[in-house]
A protein has these predicted regions:
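Alpha-helical scaffold domains
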Residues: 1-150
Length: 150
């Protein structure tokens, strides 16, 4: 779909039917890449929806499109502010922060050094970052020392 408005409408119609992480993570209209400013409005709505895979999709879009040139530090806060007991939401939060460590280390690292995330997300983000090939060895060593037990 090449038209942004139509792609957004179709995405919004499809989101309530997603019931697994694979479907959630594999679809993304290419036209979204050309409309990053406009896409922030539905992303905020998705993050606040309370629906597990809609929330996950919002985080996925932030991870996909807003950790490079379009990055702003408040996007880290948007993801960190999502509170849920849903495993697949929390896993995406950790994945987002691990990816942010690779792409925006100066902004993301303080979230871990200052222990600003909940314990599970903190440790899972460290685990995913340490497993990543995109994180330099020195950063991995630092991250290992930041693991927390409580």
């Amino acid at each position: 779909i090449r038209d942004y408005d139509r792609a957004l409408a179709e995405t919004e119609a499809f989101l309530p039917y997603i019931n697994n992480w694979a479907t959630c993570d594999c679809f993304c209209p290419k036209v979204f890449a050309k409309h990053k400013k406009e896409l922030l409005v539905p992303i905020r709505r998705w993050l606040d929806s309370g629906e597990a895979y809609t929330v996950r999709y919002g985080m996925e879009m932030l991870m996909r499109y807003y950790l490079d040139d379009a990055f702003r530090p408040e996007y880290l806060e948007w993801v960190a502010d999502v509170r849920s007991t849903e495993y697949y939401i929390n896993m995406m939060r950790a994945w987002y922060f691990a990816t942010a460590l690779a792409k925006q280390p100066d902004a993301a690292l303080p979230w871990l050094t200052e222990k600003r995330l909940d314990l599970w997300t903190h440790n899972k983000a460290i685990q995913k970052a340490v497993e990543s090939r995109r994180i330099p060895p020195g950063t991995k060593q630092l991250l290992r020392g930041l693991r927390s037990r409580s």
